[in-house]
From Swiss-Prot:
Claim: Zinc is one of the keywords in the record: yes
General function of this protein: Catalyzes the dehydration of methylthioribulose-1-phosphate (MTRu-1-P) into 2,3-diketo-5-methylthiopentyl-1-phosphate (DK-MTP-1-P).
InterPro entries: Aldolase_II/adducin_N (IPR001303), Aldolase_II/adducin_N_sf (IPR036409), MethylthioRu-1-P_deHdtase_MtnB (IPR017714)
GO biological process: L-methionine salvage from methylthioadenosine; monosaccharide metabolic process
Keyword Amino-acid biosynthesis: yes
Pfam families recorded: Aldolase_II (PF00596)
EC code: 4.2.1.109
GO CC terms in record: cytoplasm
Family label: Belongs to the aldolase class II family. MtnB subfamily.
Keyword terms: Amino-acid biosynthesis, Lyase, Metal-binding, Methionine biosynthesis, Zinc
The protein, known as: Methylthioribulose-1-phosphate dehydratase
Top-level taxon of the source organism: Bacteria
Length: 225
C-alpha cells in the first residue's frame, strides 16, 4: 500500500473467506438450473456496514473471486468501482433491518417463476400442512401455515423495497416471490438461507403438482351421514 492509498473500510481477509463460501454455494445452485442466463444475485453480510454481493451480469456457474464485490447498506459500491445488481437494495434493506440476517439468496428456478405467475393475482401463496414447513426457522410443527408474498415486478427497486418493508412491519417472513421473476430467501447464515430456499422450492413444486392433478376441479367435501 502506498502513501496515497486509503485503507479499505472492511476486512479483506473476511471478504476472501466469504467469496469462497458464496462461490461454492452459488455454483451448486447454478448447476441445479436456478440461475439461468446470468440471472440471480447472492450476498452475505461482511460486517455491520457492508455486504459481499455478486457483480451484475456474471455467469453464476463460473464465478471467480473477482466476481464478488462489496457494497454498503445503501447499495453503493465500496472499494472497487464495479456494478452490483440492480436489486442490491432488496438485499441491503434486510441487513439494515435485521442484524441477525447474514445471507440473502435470490434465484430464478422454473418452479419459482411459474408459481409467481400463477399466484400473482392472489398476492400470496399459502403453504399449509406440509412436514417440511418445519424447515423454516422457528417453526416446530407441520400444523401451521406459511404465507409466501407475491409482489408485482417493477424496475423501481425503491418502490419494491418499500413494499417489502411495509409487509415486514406486519408479519414474519422467510422469503417472497416477485411476479414473473423469482424467489428471495434469507437466513442467519448460508446454511439456513439455503435451507429456506430449498424448502420454498420443494413446497412450491408440490403446490404446482397439486394444481396439475386437480385441474380445474373444485374439491367438494363429502357430507357425513
Amino acid at each position: 500500500m502506498n502513501a496515497t492509498t486509503a485503507p479499505l473500510p472492511y476486512s479483506a481477509a473476511r471478504l476472501h473467506e466469504l467469496a469462497h463460501v458464496l462461490i461454492a454455494n452459488i455454483r451448486e445452485l447454478a448447476h441445479a438450473g436456478w440461475t439461468p442466463a446470468t440471472s440471480s444475485n447472492f450476498s452475505h453480510r461482511l460486517d455491520e456496514q457492508h455486504a459481499a454481493i455478486t457483480v451484475s451480469g456474471r455467469d453464476k456457474g463460473r464465478l471467480v473471486e473477482e466476481d464478488i464485490m462489496v457494497v454498503d447498506f445503501d447499495g453503493l459500491a465500496v472499494g472497487r468501482p464495479l456494478r452490483p445488481s440492480a436489486e442490491t437494495l432488496l438485499h441491503t434493506q434486510l441487513y439494515r433491518r435485521f442484524p441477525e440476517i447474514c445471507c440473502v439468496l435470490h434465484t430464478h428456478s422454473p418452479v419459482q417463476t411459474i408459481a409467481s405467475r400463477l399466484y400473482a393475482g392472489s398476492d400470496v401463496i399459502r403453504l399449509e400442512g406440509y412436514e417440511l414447513l418445519k424447515a423454516f426457522e422457528g417453526n416446530t410443527t407441520h400444523e401451521t401455515a406459511v404465507e409466501v408474498p407475491v409482489f408485482a415486478n417493477t424496475q423501481d427497486m425503491q418502490v419494491l423495497a418499500a413494499q417489502v418493508d411495509a409487509l415486514l412491519d406486519k408479519q414474519s417472513m422467510w422469503g417472497y416471490l416477485i411476479e414473473g421473476h423469482g424467489l428471495y430467501a434469507w437466513g442467519r447464515n448460508m446454511a439456513e438461507a439455503r435451507r429456506h430456499l430449498e424448502a420454498f422450492e420443494f413446497l412450491l413444486q408440490c403446490e404446482l403438482e397439486l394444481l396439475k392433478l386437480r385441474g380445474t376441479r373444485q374439491v367438494v367435501p363429502v357430507p357425513h351421514s
